[in-house]
UniProtKB/Swiss-Prot annotation:
EC number: 1.2.1.48
Reaction(s) catalysed (UniProt annotation): a long-chain fatty aldehyde + NAD(+) + H2O = a long-chain fatty acid + NADH + 2 H(+)
Catalytic site positions: E262, C301
CDD domains named among the record's database cross-references: ALDH_ACDHII-AcoD
Natural source organism: Acinetobacter sp
Description of pH dependence: Optimum pH is 9.5.
Protein name, as recorded: Long-chain-aldehyde dehydrogenase
């Protein structure tokens, strides 16, 4: 099936010529009246205009959020839970529209937005609707007359900066627990992909009290920095590059506020020899796991961009693996048969191609791909690319954020772990083995926040996600996220009528 391009007869989505910021429950033009063109990576053409906001717009959003927090912070868990469920229902009723819009804004295949991005976003709202209803405080008996009560209280107003690789889903990852915990939110979407969360806001604006959700568009230095440095937020959450994450952490220290950072990765995908013991469903699954570097055009922080293959099976495994990758269909993102779509921006496409050139220059062998492709108009397409080399090469160490895989080999278990951990990152990893003993040992030994074992790229709402080393601080998903958006109030009460006897 091929979905009709936006703004055409029969299309699932008709974009407005221009969008505004969402502040205090209203659609508000930027203070300075400046806009920028939003380019679709599918064809390289502008399809709408987005506010190029400034610090003044951030202040307006913070005004609205602080006004709303007086009531929202005190709202009952039931109220918040029911609202999150309504948000999920509204999104589900418009799933196809959101999926097509997200594809046009980001370039990813519609098969992914239909089956993963939007359904997962919906599920996150439902999951945290359940979590907040189930959350309990605590009581500690100090002695027979003294009790310590522990209450969960919202932080107040929080800032969130959303990346461009999963715009709606990453917004849901942050927004759902923040709202469930009773906070008001100011979101800054990525300037490359701002439309998706604006469409969600249009769908749910009648559900939310004014000021609980505020969205301010613009560039990082002009909007993101004023938000992250504001003394009026009680927390900042950011997903993006490690370099920008370091700045966000510095900003947070100035105001002594908590920070959640989900940053870069160079994830190892480790294939032990026993995966080739039989030509069966498990081997087929393993080969799919190898090809997962191309999911979302490789624009995933946990992209399995390093494949480590045991020497004894390297030749025969790679023969099958390359054939599997050759079957990946690159094409128009609105075609449901397309498996790899467009890179999210011209800037990103050019960066990936430079990294591919660097790989060639440093002696890495190109086993497959290695070139840009013209698919739709002037869209930003790159062939899935496989390099063969060693772990000291730049293509093994630097995050490329594209459909580029670097392959090397290892002799034994210890060398596999040594190579896997030889990186400054620690966000994700994959382990493939028929031996549960080997898989478990490897999973525990690899320094990463999530280790997929005989699977990859599964992102359930109730599994904690986050990085080791320079891949970030804190976690996302799982019920523990409520704690990340709350603070604990201890009420220590004496029920005794007698003095303590000190004075």
């Amino acid at each position: 099936m091929h979905y009709v391009d936006p703004n055409q007869s029969g299309s699932k989505i008709h974009f407005k010529d221009q969008y505004e910021n969402f502040i205090g429950g209203q659609w508000v033009a930027p203070v300075k009246g400046v806009y920028f063109d939003n380019i679709s990576p599918v064809d390289g053409k502008s399809f709408t205009r987005i506010p190029r906001s400034s610090a003044e717009d951030i202040e307006l959003a913070l005004d609205a959020a602080h006004k709303a927090k007086k009531e929202w912070n005190k709202s009952s868990p039931t109220t918040r839970s029911n609202l999150l469920l309504k948000i999920a229902d509204r999104m589900e009723a418009n799933l196809e529209m959101l999926a097509v819009a997200e594809t046009w804004d980001n370039g990813k295949p519609v098969r992914e937005t239909l089956a993963a991005d939007i359904p997962l976003a919906i599920d996150h709202f439902r999951y945290f609707a359940g979590c907040i209803r189930a959350q309990e405080g605590g009581i500690s008996e100090i002695d027979e007359d003294t009790i310590a009560y522990h209450f969960h209280e919202p932080l107040g107003v929080v800032g969130q900066i959303i990346p461009w690789n999963f715009p709606i889903l990453m917004a849901a990852w942050k927004l759902a627990p923040a709202l469930a915990a009773g906070n008001c939110v100011v979101i800054k979407p990525a300037e490359q992909t701002p439309v998706g969360i604006l469409l969600v806001a249009e769908l749910i604006q009648d559900l939310l009290p004014a000021g609980v959700l505020n969205i301010v568009n613009g560039y990082g230095a002009e909007v993101g920095r004023p938000l992250a440095t504001s003394p009026r937020i009680a927390k900042i959450a950011f997903t993006g590059s490690t370099q920008v994450g370091q700045l966000i952490m510095q900003y947070a220290t100035e105001n002594i506020i908590p920070v959640t950072l989900e940053l870069g990765g160079k994830s190892p995908n480790v294939f032990f020899a026993d995966v080739m013991d039989h030509d069966d469903d498990f081997l087929d699954k393993t080969l799919e796991g190898f090809a997962m570097f191309a999911l979302n055009q490789g624009e995933v922080c946990t992209c399995p961009s390093r494949a480590l293959i045991q020497e004894s099976i390297a030749d025969q495994f790679m023969e099958k693996a390359i054939e599997r990758v050759k079957r990946i269909k690159l094409g128009h993102p609105l075609d449901t048969d397309t498996m790899v779509g467009a890179q999210a921006s011209l800037e990103q496409q050019e960066k990936i191609l430079r990294c591919i050139d660097t790989g060639r220059q440093e002696g890495a062998e190109v086993l497959l791909g290695g070139h840009g492709r013209q698919e739709v108009g002037n869209g930003y397409y790159i062939e899935p690319t496989i390099f063969k080399g060693h772990n000291n090469m730049q293509v093994f160490q630097e995050e490329i954020f594209g459909p580029v895989l670097s392959v090397t080999t290892f002799k034994d278990f210890d060398e596999a772990i040594q190579i896997a951990n030889d990186t400054m990152y620690g966000l994700g990893a994959g382990v493939w083995s028929r031996s549960t003993h080997t898989a478990y040992r490897a999973g525990r030994a690899i320094e990463a926040g999530r280790v997929w074992t005989n699977c990859y790229h599964i992102y359930p709402a109730h599994a904690a996600f986050g990085g080791y080393k320079k891949s970030g601080v804190g976690r996302e998903n799982h019920k523990m996220m409520l704690d990340h958006y709350q603070q604990t109030k201890n009420l220590l009460v004496s029920y005794s009528t007698k003095a303590m006897g000190f004075f």
